[in-house]
Amino acid sequence: MNKKAMAAAVSMILAGGAHAAQQERPNVIVIIADDMGYSDISPFGGEIPTPNLQAMAEQGMRMSQYYTSPMSAPARSMLLTGNSNQQAGMGGMWWYDSTIGKEGYELRLTDRVTTMAERFKDAGYNTLMAGKWHLGFVPGATPKDRGFNHAFAFMGGGTSHFNDAIPLGTVEAFHTYYTRDGERVSLPDDFYSSEAYARQMNSWIKATPKEQPVFAWLAFTAPHDPLQAPDEWIKRFKGQYEQGYAEVYRQRIARLKALGIIHDDTPLPHLELDKEWEALTPEQQKYTAKVMQVYAAMIANMDAQIGTLMETLKQTGRDKNTLLVFLTDNGANPAQGFYYESTPEFWKQFDNSYDNVGRKGSFVSYGPHWANVSNAPYANYHKTTSAQGGINTDFMISGPGITRHGKIDASTMAVYDVAPTLYEFAGIDPNKSLAKKPVLPMIGVSLSAISPAKYRSRRAELRG
């Protein structure tokens, strides 16, 4: 499809949405997966069963050329604002000597930008947030400060998925805590991240008056490491990955070709692995397969929680007038424990024995081999890199006005285009002044405005 045809097709996507917004304001729900690879879920060629996301894909459409940042916080800042991550204050992930005190690297959302939550709240929406925030914890940068009426937020970048809430490492400890509506909270004994986030979101949606539209931000921390899932979910994938990473990768490539996401004549990339699967000992193979088993369980469980959200929308009569967006913040993460700059003493607290992998008290990451599988068809490029495997991730949209059901569109879309697109669907003026002082205009454009004449180029910094 040439660029002119792409632009025409994408304009058709929004034609119904703009009309619907004039009649009845749609609910808008943004669902985010954390560190998930391009081909992990079934709509993008994955073997992990994700029936609810598959249903969303069949009732809506997929964008195969959606681009984001190679790192979490910068991506989330662009998604929530429609601005660049530097404009939003998230120019990088950490404080470096060269960026301390520099505008654009405050590492928190600044007042130079307006968030979707602020604009939807101004339009009368009940604005709800559950899950990972990672956009600042100081006054003026928290979810409550940035437009959410209610927020159950994990404030940091990553943590245990159970109630022990152990940080990713010593470097993450300062913002490893949860808040509900701005107040720190402890976690119940039965806490598991994906289930808790969805449960809270469902409760708030059910409590919202039927006549009031909802803007919801459901930001899962799955499948970010540490890889952990409830036992019953891990058991579902027993033995599935004992064939090894190279074979699973080849199978994903075949399904990507069958879907038309990559061409039939695309050569299979060479996986530059430290050890081929066959070179591993039987014990190493068994352990490695178990780690991927846990990763798959996390994604399947996340999909089930999305299913509870869809059921809530039906129960509350919102399912026919809700725009659903699903996306991933960045590509799969190849890193292992050392990445989080923790001391040997930190790692002594974990039991990573085979039987305990994936349970509370363990901390495992799946490393570069399985990350290559997750990022198929992109070999050896991943989170932290500004190559395809780090920045070309999943995007799906369904709901009123989305008429190309089941289609996979190859139009180019960027993370900062999401906010203006959703504003157009909801009939919200993105230029209305909400702040006491002027804010920067968005750099993103609505999907309906993308055309060859409006070609834009932006480059991400490494780890930003």
From Swiss-Prot:
Organism the protein comes from: Klebsiella aerogenes
Gene3D superfamilies reported for this sequence: Alkaline Phosphatase, subunit A (3.40.720.10)
Annotated catalytic residues: S72 (nucleophile), H134
EC nos: 3.1.6.1
Cofactor (UniProt): Ca(2+)
Gene: atsA
Full protein name: Arylsulfatase
Residues modified as 3-oxoalanine (Ser): S72
GO MF terms held by the record: arylsulfatase activity; metal ion binding
EC primary class: hydrolase
Domain of life of the organism encoding this protein: Bacteria
InterPro entries in alphabetical order: Alkaline_phosphatase_core_sf, Sulfatase, Sulfatase_CS, Sulfatase_N
Reaction catalysed by this enzyme: an aryl sulfate + H2O = a phenol + sulfate + H(+)
Protein residues bound to Ca(2+): D34, D35, S72, D329, N330
